[in-house]
Amino acid sequence: VSVMDKIKDYLHPHMIIILESTTYPGSTRELILPYIKNDNLILGKNICLCFSPERIDPGNKTYNTSNTPKIIGGLTPLCSKTGKKLYSTIINEVIVVDSPETAEMVKLLENTFRAINIGLANEVAIMCEKLGVNAWEVIEAAATKPFGFMKFTPGPGLGGHCIPIDPYYLSWKLNT
């Protein structure tokens, strides 16, 4: 919010503000929108506000900025359309969702799904060790099923700065 305190005086018509940082559902509307409401700025008319989660996987040689679909949710249809037009200049596929809250929730679902499945893979490895079964062989064999199974492997735990904390954003929001 302190960032908005610093930039609010520089906001002017024909700008688009897009929040990409992982956050709880509702934060774009609750924390950013109040700063752009004034006599000169009319949301969806001459200024736009959107949320578009960052979805980059650092070090991934297959998926990069241009070929990873981009999600965007604007506070108005014009905001979404403007955000899509901007991102479409550098990203192959831009998917518009109905609201910033939906876009915010997409990121939390993606990261919570990843956290749970990494934890499950680690638990399976512990169980396999106790049973004298090769966990890697179990996972590789299970991965041959063409549907209903997504391969996750055991390792040192959750990586990155966001995966471990993202489920807590949702928990906090639901308990406020």
Where are these regions (language model features)?
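Structural/interface elements that position substrates and couple domains in central-metabolism enzymes
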Residues: 1-176
